[in-house]
Amino acid sequence: MLTLARQQQRQNIRWLLCLSVLMLLALLLSLCAGEQWISPGDWFTPRGELFVWQIRLPRTLAVLLVGAALAISGAVMQALFENPLAEPGLLGVSNGAGVGLIAAVLLGQGQLPNWALGLCAIAGALIITLILLRFARRHLSTSRLLLAGVALGIICSALMTWAIYFSTSVDLRQLMYWMMGGFGGVDWRQSWLMLALIPVLLWICCQSRPMNMLALGEISARQLGLPLWFWRNVLVAATGWMVGVSVALAGAIGFIGLVIPHILRLCGLTDHRVLLPGCALAGASALLLADVVARLALAAAELPIGVVTATLGAPVFIWLLLKAGR
């Protein structure tokens, strides 16, 4: 028994090391790739100082943090709602953040500062997450809870579409492209949003014990002495915060929070002591690679990263649904 535990521990360490190496390689590729390829040897030249340190580095850091936040949010929501299909985009949390941001643009007539828009996006995500938690407390089946989340997402999407369609504001019309997801406008001025993600990410990665209990189910977690009300509300707040900040930085990006935790679980990373940091590393790597594809796929324009993740993630999502139905 002890030998099996040690083997599992060594395997977990190997997975985390491999994911760390993958993330570092994706980070280097993101800094080098672009309209002009700049190798690491040229990073400290005047050209490298402009393109790498002033343009690509803040974007790369934002992609890394958002990818980690979305993947961890997916893992947390799947444990919290006891639903393997739960993730911020599918359950409408990302769209809720978008509604909050668009409401801020409308009410502020485009005059609100970026920090106020970010806070409104966070508030919108929190409201939708709290509504979902309210549904969860009514002991709905997992399929009904999933449908409730999808319905909330559709309502939020309809509200955003109506607002953009009837708006005469140039800023609001530009949000239509922004809501497809993209890091094109990220620079060092958004560093406060990046910093707002770091403490929550680190804190959640340290909460493996309550997450493992939640993954066992509500009854088992209560029998083990876990204060469910406290942890549900704290994790809801943390997840809403991460999703809101991510939407404020880059718009709505789907499938990262759904696919990454599933893939890692299929690889044997079921313990949240390994799953949570693994999701952070794998989510960051996946979004960094998707961002490189978004930048390089077209010569004269940049693809919205939400389109790239949806194109790559939708087939995986369908495969997971078929696999779960067997």
Curated annotation (Swiss-Prot):
It comes from the Bacteria. It is a multi-pass membrane protein. GO terms for cellular component: plasma membrane. It is found in: Cell inner membrane. GO terms for molecular function: vitamin transmembrane transporter activity. GO terms for biological process: cobalamin transport. It holds the Pfam family FecCD. Keywords: Cell inner membrane, Cell membrane, Membrane, Transmembrane, Transmembrane helix, Transport. The chain crosses the membrane at residues 15-35, 61-81, 88-108, 112-132, 146-166, 184-204, 240-260, 274-294, 302-322. InterPro entries: ABC_BtuC-like, ABC_transptr_BtuC, ABC_transptr_permease_BtuC. The keyword tRNA processing does not apply. The complex is composed of two ATP-binding proteins (BtuD), two transmembrane proteins (BtuC) and a solute-binding protein (BtuF). Part of the ABC transporter complex BtuCDF involved in vitamin B12 import. Involved in the translocation of the substrate across the membrane. NCBIfam families: PRK03784.1. Belongs to the binding-protein-dependent transport system permease family. FecCD subfamily. This is Vitamin B12 import system permease protein BtuC. It comes from Escherichia coli (strain SE11).
